[in-house]
Amino acid sequence: MKKFIREKFNSILRSEAHKAGVIPVQSPDDENQRLAEIERLGIMDRDLSGERKYNTMTQVASYLTGCKHTMINILESKIQQCKSSFGFNMIENTVIKEMPREISVCQYTLENPSQPLVIEDLWEDERTKNMSKMRGGALPSDFMQGLP
C-alpha cells in the first residue's frame, strides 16, 4: 500500500478505535532499550514474508493451536508490522501488514514484558473486547498468544 494511503488508513483505524473505547497500553519502562534492539536487528526494514523459517513457524502455530490465522508481528513505537502470516487472503494480508500499535492486540504483550501473554477469548477479554466494536471488527481470531 502506498505510504499516503497507509497513513490515511491508519488514521481511520485510530479514529475507529477511539470511538470504540480501545485503550492503548502504556509504554514499558524498558521501551527505549526494546526499540534499540529492534533497530539493531534491522527487522523493521526487512520483508520476512518470503523466508521459509518464519512461514514454517506460522504454519506450525496454526496447526498446534487450531487457529485459522497466525502471525509474527513486531511492535515499533507507533506501529505494528506483520512480518509473516498464515491463513489470510491477499486483501487481509494487505490490511494486517501494518497498523497503529495502539489498536493492535499485540500491544498487550508490553504490559508484562517478562511473561508470555495468552488471551483465550479476544471477544470477551476486557482488554480487547472493544476492538470488535470497530467498523469491520479488528479481531482476526478468537485466541491470542504473544511473546514480548
What label would you give each PLM region?
Residues 68-69, 75-85, 90-145:
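Regulatory sensory and allosteric helical modules in signal-transduction proteins
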Residues 2-97:
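Intrinsically disordered, low-complexity terminal regulatory regions
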